[in-house]
């Protein structure tokens, strides 16, 4: 049966996702940056309160995936901490200046990761040649690749996703579709034979604050709503998981 990973930007969201039936959580912070490394406090709290597999992302900053020496050392330190805390896996990715997998650095990451299941994240979608990147990641023995098929969303990238699934049919990383995967389009990915789906399955929720200071934001964008935040929608996760169960070969023959 196709598995559902839910992208969570807080431990609260991870707990909601677990209760709603998610198979796994990708734990991040920094939604506006597309996902950054969660704090040590968040890692510890997730480890203590969430029982399904949690894979924290290790991404020290927004922007591209070609990192400075300091960035890379920080990443290795974060991976070591995640490993030592006993998480099931980690989500990471490093490219070189020409848009290829940075093999020397990824070998270091695989070594530091130890027994962690490594997901190569959507840095894959910024690679110059996806099939060469796939071969390199298979050589590294990464567990899975999170990808939109090198398009802005995974539905637009279905053609490449199908090619990647076909190329890994017998062996190689699991292809996990992500970016714009929703209840309304997930059947397309199931029909394409994709084994794992990644979704934020979320909504914007209002602040609980009664007093709301007007005219001040915490960033350069003065139009940002400081009195709302993004959160996993448990009902959406439940509905997505139900569709996955009903769409499985076993369910169709019972």
Curated annotation (Swiss-Prot):
This protein's UniProt keywords: Cytoplasm
GO cellular component annotations of the record: cytoplasm
InterPro entries: CutC-like, CutC-like_dom_sf
Subcellular location field: Cytoplasm
Record flagged with keyword RNA-binding: no
UniProt keyword annotation of Cytoplasm present: yes
Pfam families, alphabetized: CutC
Record-level Gene Ontology MF annotations: copper ion binding
PANTHER family according to UniProt: COPPER HOMEOSTASIS PROTEIN CUTC (PTHR12598), COPPER HOMEOSTASIS PROTEIN CUTC HOMOLOG (PTHR12598:SF0)
Family: Belongs to the CutC family.
NCBIfam families: PRK11572.1
Name of the protein in its database record: PF03932 family protein CutC
Protein source organism: Yersinia pseudotuberculosis serotype O:1b (strain IP 31758)
């Amino acid at each position: 049966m196709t598995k559902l990973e839910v992208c969570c930007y807080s431990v609260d969201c991870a707990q909601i996702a677990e209760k709603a039936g998610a198979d796994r959580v990708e734990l991040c912070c920094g939604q506006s940056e597309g996902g950054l490394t969660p704090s040590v406090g968040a890692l510890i709290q997730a480890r203590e309160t969430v029982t399904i597999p949690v894979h924290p992302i290790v991404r020290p900053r927004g922007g591209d995936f070609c990192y400075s020496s300091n960035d890379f050392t920080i990443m290795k330190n974060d991976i070591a901490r995640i490993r030592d805390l006993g998480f099931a896996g980690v989500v990471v990715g490093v490219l070189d200046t020409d848009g290829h997998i940075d093999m020397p650095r990824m070998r270091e990451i695989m070594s530091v990761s130890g027994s962690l299941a490594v997901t190569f994240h959507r840095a894959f979608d910024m690679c110059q040649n996806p099939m060469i990147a796939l071969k390199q990641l298979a050589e590294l023995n990464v567990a899975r690749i999170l990808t939109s098929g090198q398009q802005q969303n995974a539905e637009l990238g279905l053609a490449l996703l199908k090619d990647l699934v076909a190329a890994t049919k017998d062996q190689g990383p699991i292809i996990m579709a992500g970016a714009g995967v929703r209840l309304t389009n997930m059947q397309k990915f199931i029909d394409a034979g994709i084994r794992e789906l990644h979704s934020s399955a979320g909504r914007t929720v209002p602040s609980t604050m009664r007093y709301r200071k007007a005219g001040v934001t915490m960033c350069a964008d003065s139009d940002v709503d400081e009195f709302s935040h993004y959160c996993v929608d448990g009902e959406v996760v439940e509905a997505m998981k139900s569709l996955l169960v009903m769409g499985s070969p076993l369910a169709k023959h019972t």
